Amino acid sequence: MRLFRSLTLLLASLLMTVAAPAAFADDTYQVEMILVRQNAVPAIVSRAAPEDWAAGAQRLGNDSQRTPALNDVVTKLTASGEYTVLMHKAWQQSLGEAPAKVAVSEGQEQFGQFPIEGTLEMKLGRFTDVTADFWVNQIDANGLVTASEHLRQDSHTKNGQLNYLDNGHLALLIKITSLTAPAPREAPEVVPD
């Protein structure tokens, strides 16, 4: 009896050891974001963006960028006249329980600064924790940032859904979709009795 119990405990601990790394392994996700200006809200000009705006963040490489899927949302936002779409990007990256921070930018770089620049930090859990930190910069003829609009927002987002992060004058729409999770099964046409 003791031998059987010992073997059972040994087998259970072995299975937990083998299965545990898979439970905490990073998965591949597609991240898509749309940064907008809300036209009806007065601009809030903040201090100029810091020179080290991307500190600690991984830059998006061309190989990770993907074709955006939310073009219909961009069309509706633009047609409404209530929003100005400033940036629309999509990329693929690994996400897990450890925070992953990426640097995202748009426009011509001048002395390390972009017209639109910022970081997204994401961490998987029950929800995906997102910290968005973006600047929309006014750059003068000498390449110096003279003024910035700033969006800083923390949110718990649901994967696979379009999430709206409101920060007054600027807002961010973000959708994080797993590329490795199994697709949901279709509901049967007829439910058996």
Predicted regions and their residues:
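Bacterial N-terminal signal peptides that target proteins for export
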Residues: 1-11
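Extended, low-hydrophobicity segments enriched in charged/polar residues
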Residues: 24-156, 160-165, 179, 185
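Short, low-complexity, Pro/Ser/Thr/Gly-rich segments in the mature regions of secreted, periplasmic
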Residues: 171-193
